[in-house]
Swiss-Prot record:
Function per UniProt: Antimicrobial activity against Gram-negative bacterium E.coli.
Family per similarity comment: Belongs to the frog skin active peptide (FSAP) family. Brevinin subfamily.
Protein's name in the database: Palustrin-1a
Keyword hit for NAD: no
C-alpha cells in the first residue's frame, strides 16, 4: 500500500512540476 502511495505522490509531483513550468515559465 505504501509503495502505491509513494508512486502516486511521484506522479502528482511530475504533474505539479509541469503545471509550474506552464504557468511560470510558459512551457506548455
Amino acid at each position: 500500500a505504501l509503495f502505491s502511495i509513494l508512486r502516486g505522490l511521484k506522479k502528482l509531483g511530475k504533474m505539479g512540476q509541469a503545471f509550474v513550468n506552464c504557468e511560470i515559465y510558459k512551457k506548455c
